[in-house]
Amino acid sequence: PHVYGKTDADAVFGFLYAQCEDDFPRVELNYITAMGRVAEVEGEEKLYHDLRQRLFYDTLMAESIYRTSPAWLKRLCQAFADGVNYYLQTHPEVKPKLINRFQPWMPFLFSEGSIGVDIESISVNRIKEFYGKGSVQLEVEHRNEEPEPRGSNGFAIAPARSASGNAMLLI
């Protein structure tokens, strides 16, 4: 959606409210997944998926990052939480599966950006073997070439390569 506000925080609030209007279940599931709490909603078979998630992302770390963030960033994060929570307040017919109140630290669960680590490449079965009754076999993959990078289309341009003489970061 196109959202306009007098401040950046106003725009964040409006964007999250609009996103919840479009698909609150997806918004909530994204954060349930990020917190490694899917098994609480979908059942025990998701426990190892949650474990894998928690090996990479830590809610306590997200809270710590939020607490030490500059005031301008805290305002944006609070606007995120306020936008989702206001949506829930004004739509009592919407019943969250797990998260009844969104917190301003939650966006830091995604602080790696879209080009961060790909936890899906870590085998849930290997995690089950390691923590369960099975044994883990070490695998060494030999490659003659580097693996193809995966992620978003973000890239940087050095000042010497730009017409303006300025560095550019395109995300």
Where are the regions that the model predicts?
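Substrate-recognition/specificity elements adjacent to catalytic centers across diverse enzyme folds
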Residues: 2-168
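Extended polysaccharide-engagement surfaces of secreted carbohydrate-active enzymes
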Residues: 171
